[in-house]
């Protein structure tokens, strides 16, 4: 037996054993939830925190559907909050007044809850699912957050790590695969199923890591053969970073082809951004925008050579993308894709004209345009057609109008980006900022106040995004999840340190692509 055959057989054995353990755990999950409702919720929570919930979707659906009819234990904050969070994450509306039982006669949360650290963490996690106007959840976040921060001074090291991570990375606003490593370390087995879950998660993680590495090879090959890095030397050459967006948004391993395909339009968002922000003259940018709006290959005749190269590559990529979607899903998305690219370039051009004039727009006007220039709409429109679910005239018409599930994610990206003054990769060029526009507009306002305003607006956009989780719409659950994951990825992409580096992003890439989880 040669080495290759032995390796193949070993991997095959691992896969078979992994599949058997998964089936066992599905049975365990059903049985646990049947015998003890709270324990079933705890197990679902662990499955999600380990990033392997895509293996248990049917079981989770069935259990949470039954949980809707269960009256929460009135005196157990952890159970009430956990059930609230899991159901809302799954699209079930649970009223915020379930937490009124934990208030005193004055209508404020009981101070005695400060002794229940586990319950407070669950309350803080639940409060992240709030929507506009839900004052009880706003109060719950402030109350639990304050007491948890206070507790850090007297808890042991292990619990400090858990509490601090909850405050810094609440589950609903974090990427589960990235946070799974922390859960491996901090979670302690108090039942028979957690160790088996961890074992399955480790195998799953290593298998998915190999899949991602193969996708990077495919993406890098496409990018190299495209040749734009040589032709457009002023532009960013970061195919790995572009792929990370796709990897974060589309977490189901079965979506391998979709991740590779999605990275292609993402790369063009960055390239075109650099043309507008770094290299192009205003006159040339106007011509390029007109060409994209016309969407005719003959429209490039009057463009400079580097723009001809970029437009031709964009044109070919988009047509090829449309053909693949049509062959696989029976719908030609070309018209929607053309609209998204034209809208992006129009928004880029608006910004170029602003900065060429030396005048800052009103903050509201800046943000309205910035939602489009973020590129999120382009990415999510392509993603919708790649997923291929619920493609109807109604859903496509709504998609073309930039619905809230897109615009809120885009606003979060734009505002997060604007919180930092650093430019990606120390690039020169035009650079606007909501903070700068707000300061210009509000005389006497300090930069700290402007930043606080921006942070509050990000929180408000998350509430709008949460509302989309709970509102009927024609989009499939896979698209909603991908949109949420995009919003969750944003802090990693835009949290610069003092050296204008992205330490969180580098850590994410290292964990997801290069580090093997020991078995």
UniProtKB/Swiss-Prot annotation:
Sites where the protein binds Mg(2+) 2: 273, 277
Residues annotated to bind Mg(2+) 1: 273, 277
Primary subcellular site in the record, as a coarse category: cytoplasm
Alphabetical list of InterPro entries matching this protein: Isoprenoid_synthase_dom_sf, Terpene_cyclase-like_1_C, Terpene_cyclase_plant_C1, Terpene_synth_N, Terpene_synth_N_sf, Terpene_synthase-like, Terpene_synthase_metal-bd, Terpenoid_cyclase/PrenylTrfase
Principal EC category: lyase
Disulfide bonds: none
Transmembrane segments: none
Physiological role: Involved in monoterpene (C10) and sesquiterpene (C15) biosynthesis. Converts geranyl diphosphate (GPP) into S-linalool and farnesyl diphosphate (FPP) into (3S)-E-nerolidol. Exclusively present and highly expressed in the fruit of cultivated (octaploid) varieties.
Name of the protein described by the UniProt record: (3S,6E)-nerolidol synthase 1
Organism encoding this protein: Fragaria ananassa
């Amino acid at each position: 037996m040669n080495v290759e055959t032995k390796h193949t057989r070993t991997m095959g054995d691992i896969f078979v054993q992994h599949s058997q353990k998964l089936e066992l755990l599905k049975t365990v999950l059903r049985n646990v939830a049947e015998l003890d409702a709270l324990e079933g919720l705890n197990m679902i929570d662990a499955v999600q925190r380990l990033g392997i919930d895509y293996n248990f979707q049917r079981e989770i659906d069935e259990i949470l559907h039954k949980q809707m009819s269960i009256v929460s234990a009135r005196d157990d904050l952890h159970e009430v909050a956990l059930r609230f969070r899991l159901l809302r994450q799954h699209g079930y509306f649970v009223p915020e007044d379930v937490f009124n039982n934990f208030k005193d006669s004055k209508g404020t949360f009981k101070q005695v809850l400060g002794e229940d650290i586990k319950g407070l963490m669950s309350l803080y996690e639940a409060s992240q699912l709030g929507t506009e106007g839900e004052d009880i959840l706003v109060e719950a976040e402030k109350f639990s957050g304050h007491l948890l921060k206070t507790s850090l001074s007297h808890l042991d090291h292990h619990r400090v790590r858990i509490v601090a991570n909850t405050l810094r990375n609440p589950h609903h606003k974090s990427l589960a695969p990235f946070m799974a490593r922390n859960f491996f370390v901090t979670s302690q087995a108090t039942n028979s199923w957690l160790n088996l879950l961890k074992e399955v998660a480790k195998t799953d993680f290593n298998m998915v890591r190999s899949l991602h590495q193969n996708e990077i090879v495919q993406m890098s090959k496409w990018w190299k053969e495209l040749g734009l890095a040589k032709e457009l030397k002023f532009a960013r050459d970061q195919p790995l970073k572009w792929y990370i967006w796709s990897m974060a948004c589309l977490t189901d391993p079965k979506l391998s082809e979709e991740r590779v395909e999605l990275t292609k339009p993402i790369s063009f968002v960055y390239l075109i951004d650099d043309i507008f922000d770094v290299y192009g003259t205003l006159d040339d940018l106007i011509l390029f925008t007109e060409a994209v709006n016309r969407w005719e290959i003959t429209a490039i005749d009057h463009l400079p050579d580097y723009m001809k190269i970029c437009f031709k590559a964009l044109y070919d990529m988009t047509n090829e993308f449309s053909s693949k979607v049509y062959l696989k899903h029976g719908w030609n998305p070309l018209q929607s894709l053309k609209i998204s690219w034209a809208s992006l370039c129009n928004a880029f051009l608006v910004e170029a004209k602003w900065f060429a004039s030396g005048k800052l727009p009103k903050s509201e006007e800046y943000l309205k345009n910035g939602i489009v220039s973020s590129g999120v709409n382009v990415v999510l429109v392509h993603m919708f057609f790649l997923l291929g679910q619920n493609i109807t005239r109604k859903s496509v018409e709504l998609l073309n109008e930039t619905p809230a599930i897109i615009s809120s994610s885009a606003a979060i990206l734009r505002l997060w980006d604007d919180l930092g003054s650093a430019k990606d990769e120390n690039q020169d060029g035009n650079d606007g900022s909501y903070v700068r526009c707000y300061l210009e507009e509000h005389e006497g306002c300090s930069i700290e106040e402007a930043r606080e305003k921006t942070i509050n607006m990000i929180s408000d956009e998350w509430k709008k995004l949460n509302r989309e989780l709970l509102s009927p719409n024609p989009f499939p659950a896979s698209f909603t999840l991908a949109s949420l994951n995009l919003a969750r990825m944003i802090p990693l992409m835009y949290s610069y340190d003092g050296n204008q580096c992205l330490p969180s992003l580098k850590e994410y890439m290292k964990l997801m692509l290069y580090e093997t989880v020991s078995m």
